């Protein structure tokens, strides 16, 4: 069992035959929530196990000092100290990056806001024999000079939560990166030296004062052109330093297949540039690359310690949650209190079992309707990939705008992602292989841009999800049906939420459906529509 004590808390259970994981926020419905108790119970129930069946509990935390077994709070559950291991935060990320990846031997790079000690960037050589740390940032340089902490600081300056770096990345495409010319980072050998001298927004203010730059007022949230240019400057500088760092660590390891993890590895724009670097043969980033994957990395480490063999679990899906039965879905549809349904807004609805949900959903999308799509087990990472999704027609900006105005209520500069059959992707996007986790942002091909404007960002890119029918047969069938109806085998895909964690249970999905303005909801084989 793996547990993350920090923000984005959660639990994971790994056995020789299965992996189950979930974030605490999906269960208590509080974004970025710490905690692990509900997540642990969820994992045990999904596996049909008791806590006494667990051989080892591995814990990581966020902070300068690692937790001790006594500080974990596990003793009150009857877990003795000799069944508890404490794992370094960055090593947990490294286990997630390598063990879930496709490469037998890999260079592993972890770039996060912070971990234990003063880590901000670390790199490893990973193979079947183990994961060996080869280097990292200068321990004498505080975390304020790290890539992740710098990105967090600018994100806070712009007025968002430090964990909302994706907003800064999206805003960056609207700005001019050359508006500010001083370098934000230097790389010496394999060490990064950032120019900020403090963390958080105050570090940006001090840097601006020292350089004479005007990044606009704190909290501009994209409404001030100086802040927009600041986002563009930051993103450009981060792309440059990451590319330099990847090439530097490859020169040390001698291995050109790269696995990356840590919150910075969710920067899909930078990832797309890294995969094109000379000397990079392959790039893998696990979908729960941020601290959402900490518990899973801990559990993988624990299995390694128990068996003596490094677990290799190459993934093709981010579905680490459990599926829900028809009986559980019907409890919610019947408003049974046992379903956990909390109706934020009462909206009468009708429901029935649909014989072909993929074809029915595709027909609705083709007619311009916005739908919720709830299937199988939930995704662990921050992106909905066809299990907990809201879907729309990408052929016009009208669906995109309606989605923002009526349901998502988010910043207009943030793009929506396209889902496309893997076999069709190269006809629409500048890709040369699968991109199943929305962790690359390639260019949309010129001939395709006018056909799918709802998913094209202002810079002509898109955060692509390729769909493999062998991995996600139902979602693939939906996209293929939509393509047959419209001639465009691309569907707009975004996470099923509205300023809340992604929905986990049928009751969560139904409550969000009632509270918002979705036209229809597909819960497994059931179609739900408002009266």
Could you describe each region identified by the protein language model?
Residues 40-46, 55-63, 478, 486:
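Short HxH-centered metal-ligating active-site micro-motif
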Residues 233-258:
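Phosphate/ATP-binding catalytic cores across multiple sugar-kinase/actin-like superfamilies
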Residues 175, 181-236:
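Active-site cores of enzymes that catalyze phosphoryl transfer or operate on phosphate-rich substrates
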Residues 26-50, 242:
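N-terminal phosphate-binding loop and adjacent alpha-helix
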């Amino acid at each position: 069992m793996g547990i993350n004590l920090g923000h984005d808390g959660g639990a994971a259970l790994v056995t020789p035959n299965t992996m189950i994981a979930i974030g605490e926020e999906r269960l208590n419905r509080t974004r970025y929530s710490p905690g692990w108790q509900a997540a642990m119970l969820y994992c045990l129930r999904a596996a049909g196990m008791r806590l006494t069946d667990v051989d080892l509990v591995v814990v990581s935390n966020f902070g300068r000092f690692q937790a001790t077994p006594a500080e974990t709070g596990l003793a009150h559950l009857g877990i003795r100290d000799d069944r508890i291991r404490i794992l370094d935060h960055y090593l947990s990320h490294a286990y997630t990056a390598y063990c879930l990846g496709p490469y037998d031997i890999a260079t592993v790079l972890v770039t996060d806001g912070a971990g234990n000690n003063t880590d901000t960037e670390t790199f490893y050589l990973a193979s079947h024999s183990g994961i060996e740390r080869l280097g990292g940032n200068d321990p004498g340089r505080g975390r304020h000079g790290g890539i992740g902490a710098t990105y967090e600081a600018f994100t806070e300056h712009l007025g968002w939560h430090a964990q909302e770096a994706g907003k800064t990345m999206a805003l960056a495409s609207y700005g001019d990166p050359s508006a500010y010319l001083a370098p934000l980072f230097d790389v010496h050998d394999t060490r990064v030296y950032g120019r900020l001298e403090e963390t958080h927004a105050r570090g940006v203010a001090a840097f601006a004062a020292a350089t004479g730059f005007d990044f606009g007022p704190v909290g501009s949230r994209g409404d001030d052109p100086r802040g927009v240019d600041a986002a563009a400057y930051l993103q450009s500088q981060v792309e440059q330093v990451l590319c330099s760092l990847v090439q530097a660590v490859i020169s040390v390891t001698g291995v050109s297949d790269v696995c990356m993890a840590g919150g910075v590895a969710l920067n899909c724009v930078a990832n797309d540039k890294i995969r094109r670097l000379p000397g990079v043969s392959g790039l893998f980033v696990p979908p729960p690359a941020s601290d959402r994957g900490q518990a899973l990395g801990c559990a993988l480490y624990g299995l390694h310690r128990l068996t003596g063999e490094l677990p290799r679990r190459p993934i093709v899906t981010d579905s680490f949650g459990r599926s829900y039965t028809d009986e559980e879905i019907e409890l919610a549809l019947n408003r049974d209190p046992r379903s956990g349904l909390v109706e934020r807004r009462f909206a009468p609805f009708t429901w029935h079992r649909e014989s072909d949900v993929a074809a029915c959903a595709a027909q609705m999308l083709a007619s311009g309707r916005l739908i919720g799509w709830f299937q199988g087990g939930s995704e662990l990472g921050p992106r909905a990939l066809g299990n907990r999704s809201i879907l729309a027609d990408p052929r016009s900006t009208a669906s995109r705008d309606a989605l923002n105005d009526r349901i998502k209520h988010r910043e207009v500069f943030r793009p929506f992602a396209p889902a496309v059959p893997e076999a069709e992707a190269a006809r629409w996007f500048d890709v040369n292989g699968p991109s199943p986790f929305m962790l690359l942002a390639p260019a949309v091909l010129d001939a395709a841009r006018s056909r799918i404007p709802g998913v094209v960002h202002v810079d002509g890119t898109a955060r692509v999800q390729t769909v493999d029918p062998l991995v996600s047969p139902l979602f693939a069938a939906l996209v293929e049906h939509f393509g047959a109806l419209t001639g465009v085998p691309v569907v707009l895909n975004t996470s099923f939420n509205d300023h809340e964690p992604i929905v986990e249970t049928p009751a969560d999905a139904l409550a969000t459906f009632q509270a918002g303005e979705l036209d229809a909801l597909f819960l497994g084989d059931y179609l739900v529509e408002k009266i």
